[in-house]
């Protein structure tokens, strides 16, 4: 009973955030109507991509040295992508207001696995990136002595080939991802309560995204209810909580529910591997592995 987790923290004047996510894996956003949600008596604000653009908070870096939209604006690119963020006086009202946001989508062809994503005729997902012509997130990485490996296979008396699929796995921590962002407009100090596995890296990201000096950001990590790697990345919900606190001037708490965690948290693995191993005289002499990693 001595543990102190994010959900144990209550700050004066704290409000609550909830995230609207896309039901589609790939679709254009035709329109977003937040008027009914804003009319809810307990709703303080509804944040969309346009609002974040005004604040200079529309984009964020990712753990794979890429960038992504904090909230989808013109298009959604994966199922569960964040579309709008509601801030209300209590958690129930925030979640109720999500149902009042009307988003019109124009569904597009989707890519459902990494191998098909590399097909020449696969739909281009990151068409927002200048010069992007395929669905490779990073350059092809190679290691080893190709010439020696080719020679080993040419001289081998036995070659074994296998196709191996290492499925995607979910870390499923007991405590889901969440944050309390508390921005003080008088001092410019941002206090963050957040159980994460990389607080110094998070501070750097928040400074970059929000335009604050790192020494003006203080991250207070309480006990972490499990992480297993999925509490290393920065999630859009964190940035939205910070944006909400900057706009409202009060603490904003966002915690994903279990369904959100299962859908949208950081997954691992999902490898498609083609492997060849060769031997000569009973001794392994060469190995080739082609890996597609999602």
What are these regions, as identified by a protein language model?
Residues 31, 70, 173-177, 271:
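Residues that act as N-cap/strand-start positions at coil-to-secondary-structure junctions
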Residues 93-117, 136-144, 162, 201-202, ...:
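Gly/Pro-rich active-site capping loops and adjacent beta-alpha segments
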Residues 1-136, 159-162, 237:
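Flexible, low-hydrophobicity surface segments
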């Amino acid at each position: 009973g001595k543990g102190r987790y994010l959900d144990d923290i209550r700050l004066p004047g704290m409000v609550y955030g909830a995230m609207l996510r896309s039901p589609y894996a790939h679709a254009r956003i035709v329109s977003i109507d937040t008027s009914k949600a804003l009319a809810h008596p307990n709703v303080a604000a509804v944040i969309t991509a346009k609002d974040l653009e005004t604040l200079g908070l529309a984009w964020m870096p990712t753990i794979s040295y890429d960038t992504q939209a904090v909230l989808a604006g013109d298009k959604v690119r994966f199922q569960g992508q964040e579309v709008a963020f509601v801030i209300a006086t209590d958690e129930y009202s925030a979640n109720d207001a999500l149902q009042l946001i009307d988003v019109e989508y124009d569904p597009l062809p989707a890519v459902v696995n990494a191998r098909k994503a590399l097909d020449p005729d696969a739909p281009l997902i990151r068409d927002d990136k200048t010069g992007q012509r395929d669905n490779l997130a990073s350059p092809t990485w190679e290691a080893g002595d190709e010439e020696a490996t080719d020679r080993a296979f040419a001289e081998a008396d036995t070659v074994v080939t296998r196709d191996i699929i290492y499925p995607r796995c979910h870390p499923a921590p007991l405590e889901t991802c969440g944050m309390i962002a508390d921005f003080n407009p008088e001092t410019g100090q941002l206090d963050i309560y957040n159980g994460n596995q990389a607080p110094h890296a998070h501070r750097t990201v928040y400074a970059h995204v929000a335009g604050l000096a790192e020494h003006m950001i203080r991250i207070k990590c309480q006990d972490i209810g499990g992480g297993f790697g999925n509490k290393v990345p920065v999630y859009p919900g964190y940035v939205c909580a910070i944006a909400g606190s900057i706009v409202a001037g009060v603490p904003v708490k966002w915690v994903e529910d279990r369904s959100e965690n299962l859908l949208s948290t950081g997954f691992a693995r999902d490898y498609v591997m083609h492997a060849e191993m060769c031997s000569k005289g009973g001794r392994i002499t060469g190995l080739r592995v082609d890996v597609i990693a999602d």
